[in-house]
Amino acid sequence: MRSDDVKAGYARAPNRSLIRSLGIDESEMHQPFIGIANSWNTIVPGHTHLRVLGERVREGITAGGGTPFEFNTIGICDGIAMGHEGMRYSLPSRENIADSVELMIQAHKFDGIVCICTCDKIVPGMLMAAGRCNIPAIVLTGGNMLPGNLHGCELSLTDVFEGVGKVAGGTMTEEELTELETAAMPGCGSCQGLYTANTMACMTEALGMSLPGCAATPAVYADKIRLAYRTGKRIVDLVRKQILPRDIITPASLRNAIRVDMALGGSTNTVLHLMAIATEAGVPFDLQEFNRLSEQIPHIASMMPAGPHSMQALHHAGGIPAVFRQIRSHLENCQTVSGMDIYTIADSVKYVDESVIRPEQSPVHQSGGLMILTGSLAPDGAVIKSGAVQDEMWKHTGPARVFDGEELAMKAILAREIKEGDIIVIRYEGPKGGPGMPEMLSPTSALVGLGYSRVALITDGRFSGGTRGPCIGHVAPEAAAGGPIAFVKDGDQISIDLFTKTVNLNISADEIENRKKGWKPLKRPLTGVLARYAAAVGPADLGAVLQ
């Protein structure tokens, strides 16, 4: 066992003495040492219940014949961090979490690890650590929040963000907004729709790194507590059989994750995170794989925010196993941490609510819900949630309205300075330029709330999974790296064509070269973690991992 490095032989008597001080019994000393990386805290709604799940995981590990040791990592709520300086710290926290879990695994020589996590950057951060350390691992995702309800209508956090735009537009009062914000979020769990946290939970299950049914089970259901116990028992089996993350996270399982992502129409952030997970697991992966698979996989579930269905509805419709069944012919048969392969899980499904998870013969859209765009504005790629774009905006040309940062753009939007047909460009919000690649949910939600229907938004920053509409993010190279987006001027014509997967700046290459003369990138004063992050982070098209 790996843990023998800290507990076997007379030379390790001091180490054992410290372990015995924890109350560890002699019999426990000879069992596999299993780490539990929890991310419980009392500020993130998706994480407030994780202490209970951690207790149940410990019980499962003990029942399975292992010795559990629990520790904590940080966790940031993107929704609370949204719209202010705090958003710049969210993506860097992913690397902090991956590093923290690695540090604990390697310092204490755990034989296996259970990762308990729910929200946007915590799930990929822990998956990155699992792939990097490559000891037996299972991820337990914490589950989704139940939908809110007001006057008989189901609600999610996006309704509140869009309510801000409605107040600015005069179609909602501040009192009505207060009533909405109070009703929208009824308890613990990840935000209710197929936003980034829930999409990453689905990706985790599709990769094979969590037990079947885990992704869509709501946070407050007893099933989630049972899944925690089973996860604890199962990790001990994985240790004994030495089934490792790199046996599970393979080119084929990553392709399966993308297929499920396309079928559901998940968050654009999955592109960034799956690339990072692949890098940490040592799997070569190309950004264009997303487009290739998108053309093969129909979009079969109309999930919030683009559609009506919550994650609770997805759970009752059969969850990710039901998605496997509906697109089984497209999936590759990979092993999972459960001991069952993907086909076995798909074939074990007894019921699918096809009003939620449609058969591929009658999809929401014929192709997948995400798309990689390239062109003169994004030579190294950009991402759009095509499944959330209205038909009339699949091909659009309009004048650029350029803003060096989200705050300036938000002021212009709320002041109604944007016209229908405009293409808003928000730059210097990339991995280095932001730094931290903040999400642009506030401006996109304000546009919806104000009633705009023909305004596109392009950025080298990111979008929340709650974003809908013609919003193109992750533009690479970013402005801070001298990408073409740095040289766009107000009034330049930009063409977006989702049919050809292109986004082009309609000026000549010579004009771009002229604009480069004397160019100096916007520099924000940085200290601490953001300064270190900006100096070390790589480009978005490679997952924005530290170099």
UniProtKB/Swiss-Prot annotation:
Group of enzyme by EC: lyase
Biological processes annotated in GO: isoleucine biosynthetic process; L-valine biosynthetic process
Binding site for Mg(2+): D78, D120, K121, E439
EC id: 4.2.1.9
PROSITE patterns: ILVD_EDD_1, ILVD_EDD_2
Annotated gene: ilvD
Record-level GO cellular component terms: cytosol
UniProt family annotation: Belongs to the IlvD/Edd family.
Active site: S464 (proton acceptor)
Matches recorded under HAMAP family: IlvD
Summary of the function given for this chain in its UniProt record: Functions in the biosynthesis of branched-chain amino acids. Catalyzes the dehydration of (2R,3R)-2,3-dihydroxy-3-methylpentanoate (2,3-dihydroxy-3-methylvalerate) into 2-oxo-3-methylpentanoate (2-oxo-3-methylvalerate) and of (2R)-2,3-dihydroxy-3-methylbutanoate (2,3-dihydroxyisovalerate) into 2-oxo-3-methylbutanoate (2-oxoisovalerate), the penultimate precursor to L-isoleucine and L-valine, respectively.
PANTHER family found in the cross-reference section: D-XYLONATE DEHYDRATASE, D-XYLONATE DEHYDRATASE YAGF-RELATED
Keywords: 2Fe-2S, Amino-acid biosynthesis, Branched-chain amino acid biosynthesis, Iron, Iron-sulfur, Lyase, Magnesium, Metal-binding
Keyword match Amino-acid biosynthesis: yes
Catalytic activity: (2R)-2,3-dihydroxy-3-methylbutanoate = 3-methyl-2-oxobutanoate + H2O; (2R,3R)-2,3-dihydroxy-3-methylpentanoate = (S)-3-methyl-2-oxopentanoate + H2O
Organism listed in the record: Methanospirillum hungatei JF-1 (strain ATCC 27890 / DSM 864 / NBRC 100397 / JF-1)
InterPro entries the record matches: Dihydro-acid_dehy_C, DihydroxyA_deHydtase, DiOHA_6PGluconate_deHydtase_CS, ILV_EDD_C, ILV_EDD_N, IlvD/EDD_N
Pfam families: ILV_EDD_C, ILVD_EDD_N
Free-text cofactor note: Binds 1 [2Fe-2S] cluster per subunit. This cluster acts as a Lewis acid cofactor.
Sites where the protein binds [2Fe-2S] cluster: C119, C191
Cofactors that this protein relies on: [2Fe-2S] cluster; Mg(2+)
Protein name as catalogued: Dihydroxy-acid dehydratase
Modified positions (N6-carboxylysine) in chain numbering: K121
GO molecular function: 2 iron, 2 sulfur cluster binding; dihydroxy-acid dehydratase activity; magnesium ion binding
